[in-house]
Structures are given as structure tokens and as C-alpha cells.
Amino acid sequence: MDSNTVSSFQDILLRMSKMQLGSSSEDLNGMITQFESLKLYRDSLGEAVMRMGDLHLLQNRNGKWREQLGQKFEEIRWLIEEVRHRLKTTENSFEQITFMQALQLLFEVEQEIRTFSFQLI
């Protein structure tokens, strides 16, 4: 995994955890949880690509990995829409910068997952 992506995930998660969005903090915690889950999923796909022999293990262990991949893309699209919505509604520059970086990271991760999945298919 690219060390810039690791630091980006860590930076975004740290920044989001510092935000105080009042009644929507529960939603923000959900976004943070999904970001963490997405990072773990991306990492596991990347590792499987690095060890192509793991493809058979991955397929045997989880016969529904393509379905799972589709669900991850749905999660990414939901997160993108949620981040865009937050970006439009916030006037705080710290939050705007954080959400812009989160949006950029989501696009990068979506592309990386697509690349990994094509290599696995």
C-alpha cells in the first residue's frame, strides 16, 4: 500500500474524530467507521493481488467476494455522496478542507479497488 494513502487515511480519520457537528456526530462516527472498514477492505484486496496465489484462497474462503466487492462500491458511492453533502452544508473551513481531502481520498481508493479487482478477475 502507498504510504501516502496510509497517512491520508490516518489524517482524515483523525481530523473527522476532532469535529464537533452537534446532533450529527452519530452520522460522522458512522462515516469514520465506514472509512476504517473501507481501508481494511482495500488493504486486503491489495495484499491478495500481491500474492496472486491468494486469489484461490480468497475465492474459496468467500465464494461471494464479487458480491462483497459490489457492496464496497455501493459504500464508496454512499460515502462520496455523504461527504459531498457535508461539504455543501458546512461553512467551517477546517471541515471543508477535511471533507475535500476525504472526497479526494475516496476517489483514489475507489480507483485502487477497481484496479485490484480487475487484477483478481
Curated annotation (Swiss-Prot):
Q: Give the residue ranges of motif Nuclear export signal.
A: 12-21, 85-94
GO terms for cellular component = host cell nucleus; virion component
Q: What's a single GO BP term from this record?
A: exit of virus from host cell nucleus through nuclear pore
InterPro entries in UniProt:
Flu_NS2
Q: Where in the cell is it found?
A: Virion; Host nucleus
SUPFAM superfamilies tied to this protein = Nonstructural protein ns2, Nep, M1-binding domain
Keyword annotations: Host nucleus, Host-virus interaction, Transport, Virion
Anything further noted? Average number present in a viral particle is estimated to be 130-200 molecules.
What family is reported?
Belongs to the influenza viruses NEP family.
Subunit annotation: Interacts with protein M1. May interact with host nucleoporin RAB/HRB and exportin XPO1/CRM1.
The free-text function statement in the UniProt record for this protein reads: Mediates the nuclear export of encapsidated genomic RNAs (ribonucleoproteins, RNPs). Acts as an adapter between viral RNPs complexes and the nuclear export machinery of the cell. Possesses no intrinsic RNA-binding activity, but includes a C-terminal M1-binding domain. This domain is believed to allow recognition of RNPs bound to the protein M1.
- Protein name per the record: Nuclear export protein
Organism source for this protein? Influenza A virus (strain A/Alaska/6/1977 H3N2)
The lineage is:
Viruses, Riboviria, Orthornavirae, Negarnaviricota, Polyploviricotina
Designated gene of the protein: NS
